[in-house]
Amino acid sequence: MATAYIIGLGRSGIAAARLLKIQGWEVILSDRAHSPNLEITQQELGQEGITVKLADHPSLIDSNLPNLIVVSPGVPWDVNFLQEARDRGIDVIGELELAWRSLQSSPWVGITGTNGKTTTTALVAAIFQASGLNAPSCGNIGYAACELALSQTKTKASSFDWIIAEVSSYQIESSRELAPKIGIWTTFTPDHLSRHKTLDNYYAIKASLLRRCELQIFNGDDPYLHQVGLHQWADAYWTTVKGKEHLLCDAAKGVYLQDNWIVAFGELIAPLNLFKMVGVHNQQNLLMAVGAARLAGIEKGAIAQAIATFKGVPHRLELITNIDGIDFINDSKATNYDAAEVGLVSVNASVILIAGGEAKEGDDRRWIEQIKAKVATVLLIGEAATAFAQRLQQSNYEAYEIVETMDNAVKRGLELAKKQQAKVVLLSPACASFDQYQSFEHRGDHFRQLCQALKE
């Protein structure tokens, strides 16, 4: 029996293990961590015939080499163990690639980019589903991709009409055959450089996915993508919120805003006022989603209906509550400077900003410009608080307080908003969450709980 070794005991890894088990593989699941909860999972999977090794540091032993290694998205692609496995000719792939091998009879929409991926994925899925298509989403929202493959294998169901996949740079690295029918590239700015080393590397990884797609849609309002533009992507479809004259392509291949209408490939689709999400960046996301829908043959009426009923995505400029006329907004997904800058641009009022966490590399200057223009006080939390305070001071901005925790920040945020007549308390951290939380979702959920408790 062929042996598969899966690294990472998260949702993706467990789904991959179950899929391979059903397909007749001997499956070993490995994780570096060890905890009582993981021991429970170990026992449950053991009953399904899946071996789980905890506190495990895998090595390649000649007498017992696996035929396949499946890597979860959080595992660096260039660690020695995986490099050695590839050198020895072992098939090393990511969880998404494993799912693709089972699901490639369905057409995929693959959405990638530094920021905007998740909202665009949610919009595409909402529009496709509103038209009656069986089009589940996978990635950061919806299912793990292997969960979709598993459900189809178990039920022997017919193929999905479409699969809508959010694809990170980590997943592209480990998915050499993944080839969506429609590819969307939302934005491109420096991020994940601790893993990808250089901007050129990061761009090349993203571009490799788009080159395998049959049809490509690009955000023409993104400065970097606009710059590489037509000389690299001559056959692509382009979007812009700035009007037809700003398209990088012929209007017949463009999706754009004109006189507050959404226009796709020269045809009026829907009035923009149907769309309730704030921010120009969300209008950009919408245009890419509409482009994908029209390329998939979806009718205008279904698109308009989905736009009108779309409520947004948790942790992305999510309005939590209003207390005494002050909006509390959760933008926990803003894990870098560019996303946090967009969060501030999207709010048309004086702001109390909660920022900080585990800092990332990047250029913070435009973010700080927005702070100076919009923010009454910055409340700093987490590991980056001291460094952020110094950076703000260097920029001649002194209206900040180091409050350390989210509990302190939410309480203090309400006090200061009342005192300074700010209309919004915004969590938009510009940082990863791992210093204090398991994920940006965990951080955003905690913010939501604290806001709701404050209202009560």
Curated annotation (Swiss-Prot):
Which SUPFAM superfamilies does UniProt cross-reference here?
A: MurCD N-terminal domain, MurD-like peptide ligases, catalytic domain, MurD-like peptide ligases, peptide-binding domain
Q: In which pathway does it act?
A: Cell wall biogenesis; peptidoglycan biosynthesis
Chief subcellular location equals cytoplasm
**Highest taxon of the lineage:** Bacteria
Q: MF terms per GO, please?
A: ATP binding; UDP-N-acetylmuramoylalanine-D-glutamate ligase activity
Q: Which family does it belong to?
A: Belongs to the MurCDEF family.
Q: Which reaction does it catalyse?
A: UDP-N-acetyl-alpha-D-muramoyl-L-alanine + D-glutamate + ATP = UDP-N-acetyl-alpha-D-muramoyl-L-alanyl-D-glutamate + ADP + phosphate + H(+)
**BP GO terms, sorted:** cell division; cell wall organization; peptidoglycan biosynthetic process; regulation of cell shape
Q: Where in the cell is it found?
A: Cytoplasm
Question: EC number(s)?
Answer: 6.3.2.9
Work out whether the entry's keyword set contains Cytoplasm: yes
Q: Which InterPro entries match?
A: Mur-like_cat_sf, Mur_ligase_C, Mur_ligase_C_dom_sf, Mur_ligase_cen, MurD
List the protein's name: UDP-N-acetylmuramoylalanine--D-glutamate ligase
**Where does this protein come from, organism-wise?**
Rippkaea orientalis (strain PCC 8801 / RF-1) (Cyanothece sp. (strain PCC 8801))
Function according to Swiss-Prot or TrEMBL: Cell wall formation. Catalyzes the addition of glutamate to the nucleotide precursor UDP-N-acetylmuramoyl-L-alanine (UMA).
The UniProt entry, under Pfam families, shows: Mur_ligase_C (PF02875), Mur_ligase_M (PF08245), MurD-like_N (PF21799)
On whether Repeat is a keyword of this UniProt record, the answer is no
This protein's GO cellular component annotations are:
cytoplasm
This protein's UniProt keywords: ATP-binding, Cell cycle, Cell division, Cell shape, Cell wall biogenesis/degradation, Cytoplasm, Ligase, Nucleotide-binding, Peptidoglycan synthesis
Q: Which PANTHER family match?
A: UDP-N-ACETYLMURAMOYLALANINE--D-GLUTAMATE LIGASE
State where ATP binds: 113-119
